[in-house]
């Protein structure tokens, strides 16, 4: 009980999520995907802020699924993923799970 109460008082970092770039694999779409009317609403440069490691309002659910564990870890003050992967150890570059048109997101701790 004491540990649970103590953990709830820890200050969590805010985490900024920035949409960096989308790639489209037209050859794969033509070969495998059924035509769809509506795809991703995310725009390059779009930003969200995660507070207390929670999904920001308006964030694509599929993108959040891909990055959630990294955002939660950064919010708790953890970082240095994969032992020196990123120049900024309190950040990560994550792509969404859309195999035809993945979006890359830069996630970083902010003050």
Task: Please annotate each region the language model reported.
Residues 55-65:
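Short, Lys/Arg- and Gly-enriched loop/turn segments at beta-strand edges
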Residues 24-29:
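Short N-terminal binding/cap micro-motifs at the start of the first secondary-structure element
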Residues 30-55:
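Short, flexible N-terminal segments of the mature chain
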Residues 10-14, 100-102:
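A general secondary-structure signal for short beta-strands and their flanking turns/coil
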Residues 67-111:
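Short, compact, well-ordered microdomains
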Residues 14-22:
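A short beta-strand micro-motif
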């Amino acid at each position: 009980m004491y540990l649970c109460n103590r953990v709830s008082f820890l200050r969590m970092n805010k985490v900024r999520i920035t949409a960096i770039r989308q790639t489209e694999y037209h050859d794969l779409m033509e070969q495998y995907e059924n035509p769809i009317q509506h795809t991703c609403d995310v725009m390059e440069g779009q930003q969200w802020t995660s507070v207390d490691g929670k999904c920001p309002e308006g964030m694509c659910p599929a993108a959040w699924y891909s990055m959630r564990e990294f955002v939660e870890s950064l919010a708790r003050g953890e970082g240095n993923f994969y032992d020196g992967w990123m120049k900024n150890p309190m950040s990560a570059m994550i792509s969404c799970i859309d195999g035809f048109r993945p979006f890359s997101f830069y996630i970083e701790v902010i003050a």
